[in-house]
UniProtKB/Swiss-Prot annotation:
Entry keywords, A to Z: Hydrolase
Keyword Transmembrane in record: no
EC number(s) per entry: 3.5.1.2
Catalytic activity: L-glutamine + H2O = L-glutamate + NH4(+)
NCBIfam families: Gln_ase, PRK12357.1
Gene: glsA2
Protein name according to UniProt: Glutaminase 2
GO BP term (any one): glutamine catabolic process
Length: 326
C-alpha cells in the first residue's frame, strides 16, 4: 500500500511538471517541424508532453504525453541493441565504431575522409543504416520482426509502422541512399542497398508515445533489468554500452552540450521525441534518483534536429531534481 506521504510527493511532482510543460510549450514557436520529410512537416509543433516512469511502475505524465509519433532516430538505439543481441558486440563494432562526431547526423564527409569509410557510431545515419543490414533475417520483414519482438519484450505491446510517414521518407531519402551506396561500395553493408534502406526507414517510422520510450529508458537505466517485472530483459553489457553511446552520440552534434548542461544519456529523433534515462544514484533524495525512464515529445525542433522545448524542459527538470550523472 502506498503511504500518504508518497502520494503527496507524487502529487507535488505532477503539479511541477504541469507548470513546466505549460511554460516551455510557448518556446515551440521558436522551433520548426522536420519539413524535409513532408509528412512530419504537417505536424502541430505546439505540442509538448512528457512521461516519467519510476522503478516501482509509478508514472507521472503531463501535457501531450499520449500523442503518437514516429521513433525516427530513437530507433537507432533499438536497432543497435537488436544487432548486438543477434551478432554479438564484437561483430557489430567491427563494422560500426563508437566515436562521437561533430558533423550533422546525415553527413557523408567522414566516410570519405577516414578510410576505409567505417561509420563513426551507430547513432548517426551511416552507422544506423549499417546496423540495419546486420539485423537477423534474410528479408525486410524478418529484419523488422527482430525489432518488433525486442520492442514488445520491453513495452509489452507490439508496435506498428506509420505507413504515411514511411512513404514520405522513402520518396525523399536521397541523402540516405547516397550513404547506403557508399557503405555498400566500402563493404560495410551485408544486404541489398534498397532492402537495407527499406528496413532503416521503416524502423524510423515505427509509431510510439512518450510512455513507450520512457519504459525503454527505465530498462536501460537499470542495466537491462526491468524493475517493474523484476526480470533481466537485456544483457547488462549491451545496456551499458548503449547508454554510453547515448551519452556521447545520442543528441546529434549537440551531444557534448547536452552532456555538459543536462548530463543524462539520451537519444532524440527529428519527429520531436527524446528518450532519456536517469541511472540509479548513490544519493537518493528523490525517487527519480533511484533510476527512472523519461519520454518527451515536442515536434518543434532546433537547428540540430532536437526538440527545442523538449530540451529546455528536460534541462529544467534535471536541474530542479538534480538528475545529472556528473
Amino acid at each position: 500500500m502506498i503511504k500518504d506521504s508518497s502520494v503527496q510527493v507524487e502529487g507535488q511532482e505532477k503539479v511541477c511538471l504541469d507548470q513546466w510543460v505549460a511554460h516551455y510549450r510557448a518556446y515551440a514557436a521558436k522551433g520548426r517541424s522536420a519539413s524535409y520529410i513532408p509528412a512530419l512537416g504537417e505536424i502541430n509543433v505546439s505540442q509538448l508532453g512528457i512521461c516519467i516512469v519510476k522503478p516501482d511502475g509509478t508514472m507521472i505524465k503531463s501535457g501531450d504525453w499520449e500523442i503518437p509519433f514516429t521513433l525516427q532516430s530513437i530507433s537507432k538505439v533499438i536497432g543497435f541493441i537488436a544487432a548486438c543481441l543477434s551478432r554479438g558486440i564484437s561483430y557489430v563494432l567491427e563494422r560500426v565504431d563508437v566515436e562521437p562526431t561533430g558533423d550533422a547526423f546525415n553527413s557523408i564527409i567522414r566516410l570519405e575522409i577516414h578510410k576505409p569509410g567505417k561509420p563513426f557510431n551507430p547513432m548517426i545515419n551511416a552507422g544506423a543504416i549499417t546496423i540495419a543490414s546486420l539485423l537477423p533475417g534474410t528479408s525486410v520483414q524478418e529484419k523488422l520482426e527482430s525489432l518488433y519482438v525486442l520492442i514488445e519484450k520491453m513495452i509489452e505491446k507490439r508496435p506498428a509502422i506509420n505507413e504515411i510517414v514511411f512513404q514520405s521518407e522513402w520518396e525523399t531519402a536521397h541523402r540516405n541512399r547516397a550513404l547506403a551506396y557508399y557503405l555498400k561500395e566500402n563493404g560495410f553493408l551485408e544486404s541489398d542497398v534498397e532492402e537495407t534502406l527499406e528496413v532503416y526507414l521503416k524502423q524510423c517510422s515505427i509509431e510510439i508515445n512518450t510512455e513507450d520510450i520512457a519504459l525503454i529508458g527505465l530498462i536501460l537505466a537499470h542495466d537491462g533489468y526491468h524493475p517493474i517485472r523484476k526480470e533481466q530483459v537485456l544483457p547488462k553489457e549491451v545496456a551499458r554500452l548503449t547508454k554510453a553511446l547515448m551519452l556521447t552520440c545520442g543528441m546529434y552534434n549537440a551531444s557534448g552540450k547536452f552532456a555538459a548542461f543536462i548530463g543524462l544519456p539520451a537519444k532524440s529523433g527529428v519527429s520531436g521525441g527524446i528518450m532519456t534515462l536517469v541511472p540509479s544514484k548513490s544519493r537518493k533524495d528523490l525517487s527519480f534518483q533511484d533510476g527512472c525512464g523519461i519520454g518527451i515529445y515536442g515536434p518543434a525542433i532546433d537547428e540540430y534536429g532536437n526538440s527545442l522545448p523538449g530540451i529546455m524542459l528536460l534541462e529544467h527538470i534535471a536541474k530542479e531534481w538534480d538528475l545529472s550523472i556528473f
